[in-house]
Amino acid sequence: MTQTYLTLNNGLKMPQFGLGVFLVPDGKETIDACLNAFKLGYRHIDTAHAYQNERGVGEAIKQSGLKRDEVWITTKLWPSEYGEGTTLQAIDKMLERLQTDYIDLLLLHQQVGDYLGAWKDMEKAVKFGKVKSIGISNFKENLEDLLSHTTIKPAAIQVECHPYYPQHELKMRMAEFGTVLESWYPLGHGDTKLLNEPILKKLADKYHKTPAQIILRWHIEEGNSVFPKSTNQAHIQENFDIFDFALTDEDMQQIAKLDCGKRYYTADLEEQKRFLSWKPAD
C-alpha cells in the first residue's frame, strides 16, 4: 500500500490520508491509536487544542522512533487563542504540548472571534519557522472577509465533506489559491443510510471492500485530505487499506449522484458564537 500526497500552495507535500483523534481521550488511548497507525504506515495525525490530546500525539511521535519530518501534524487554534500577540503565545504552548519545534499545518478551528488578528500571528509564525503551513476550518460566512485580509493564502480548508455533501462549490472557490480541502465527517457522521446506499454496496462487492472503504477511496480520488477517527486497531487498518485499488470515472460519476446537499452539522454563524464562551485547558 502506498500513501498518496497532496502538494500544498507553498510547495510542501502533505500525506493525503491520516488518523483523526477527535474525542479520543488524552494519554494511553491517544498514544496507542497513533502508534498503531504509525506501524501500519500512517504519517498524518489530525488533532486540535480543543481535542485536549495534543500531548498524547506528541508522546506517540516521540515513542514511535520516527523522525520528526516523517510525520505530518495538523492541529488547530481555538477562538479563545485568537488575536495579535495572543495567538503567537498560544502557538508556543502548542509546540510544548506536542513536544516539537514546528507544526506542519496550523488551522483556525472556527470562524468566530478575532480571526484576522490570529491570522496575522500565524503568518508571523510561518516567518519564524514555528509553523510550515496555515489554513482554516469551518469557515463559511466569514470566508471572504478572511481571504481579503491575508498575505499568505490558506493552504487548506477543513470542512464537512462526504458523498452527500461533496463541497464542489467551495472547492471551485478555493481553487484559485491552490487550497486543499480536508474532510471531516468523511463517512457522513456514521450515517447508516449513506453506508447502505446501493451504489456503495455494489462498488464494495466489485472491489471486495466495505462501503466505508469505497467512500474513503472516493475522497482520495476527489483530491481531498481525509483522516477518519478510530481507536480500534482493526478499523485503523481497514481504513488505511484503500491504496490497492482505484475507482473508475464511471464509478465516480455514479457516486456523484448521491450529492443531495445533506449536512450533518447545521449550526449557523450566530449559533457558532457559543464557542467564544469556552476555553480549552492548556
Task: Label every PLM stretch briefly.
Residues 25-37, 83-98, 117, 141-144, ...:
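Short, acidic/polar
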Residues 1-6, 55, 59-61, 90-93, ...:
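Alpha-helical scaffolding within the catalytic cores
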Residues 68-81, 104-111, 138:
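A short, structured active-site edge motif that brings together acidic residues
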